[in-house]
């Protein structure tokens, strides 16, 4: 049986040493080094490369990391019962620069949290139950534990739930996506305007798969760039500048 949130809140996190490989060099990371005197968000998951972890759990924490940090969070840790090589390769493929991955290879931290569960029916051995927590100076202030039922529930340990607890009135930025063409001066102008306003964007550049036919099929237009914000088409460089002016 998993521990209750109430039984863990107000308690110190387990004092362990993680065998990590930052910069491809072995290094021991202690709980004190990660948590002492710091405000840290932790999310723990069953395994690197697994579907929910890769498609939703980690990417959303990475996306909301700047907002979490603007509300006093010093670091965001992803803990999993995997070795350092696996965790590093997973992070590299996830484009998750805002997240610190922590390999709990022997499960010592997870066991100390009471979250080590038997996943031998999947060939996983013992893994972490999915949860997230806010830790201040090594003490658990708030923890969100997924309901204990069959499968891999994902309802409360997500980044949005954590942000809502930490800063209920926080403004979550809409995702911004730009379809661009290499060498396009209007694309460069739109990108500079977004950067000048500290707006993060994802760029999809023209190549053999993303061409004018695709651009027209998605946007109904044939000129580059085309920028979307929160699923709505803003348009090209002039429209982006007008949209930014309207936000000022």
Give a label for each model feature.
Residues 1-176, 181-212, 216-224, 233, ...:
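Chalcogenol-based redox active-site neighborhoods
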């Amino acid at each position: 049986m998993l521990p209750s949130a109430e039984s863990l809140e107000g308690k110190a996190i387990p004092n362990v040493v993680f065998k990590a490989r930052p910069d491809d060099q072995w290094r021991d990371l202690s709980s004190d080094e990660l948590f002492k005197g710091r405000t840290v968000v932790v999310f723990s998951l069953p395994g690197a490369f697994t579907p929910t972890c890769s498609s939703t759990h980690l990417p959303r924490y990475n996306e909301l990391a700047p907002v979490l940090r603007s509300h006093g969070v010093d670091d965001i840790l992803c803990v999993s019962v995997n070795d350092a090589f696996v965790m590093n390769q997973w992070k590299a493929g996830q484009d998750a620069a805002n997240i610190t991955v922590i390999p709990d290879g022997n499960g010592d931290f997870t066991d100390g949290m009471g979250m080590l569960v038997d996943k031998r029916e999947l060939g996983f051995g013992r893994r972490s139950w999915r949860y997230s927590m806010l830790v201040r100076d090594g003490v658990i202030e708030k923890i969100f534990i997924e309901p204990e039922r069959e499968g891999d529930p994902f309802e409360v340990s997500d980044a949005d739930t954590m942000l809502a607890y930490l800063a209920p009135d926080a403004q979550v930025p809409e995702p911004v996506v730009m379809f661009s063409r290499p060498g396009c001066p209007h694309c460069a102008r739109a990108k500079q305007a977004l950067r000048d306003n500290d707006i993060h964007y994802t760029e999809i550049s023209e190549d053999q798969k993303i061409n004018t036919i695709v651009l027209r099929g998605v946007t109904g237009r044939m000129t580059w760039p085309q920028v979307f914000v929160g699923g709505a088409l803003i348009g090209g460089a002039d429209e982006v500048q007008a949209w930014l002016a309207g936000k000022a």
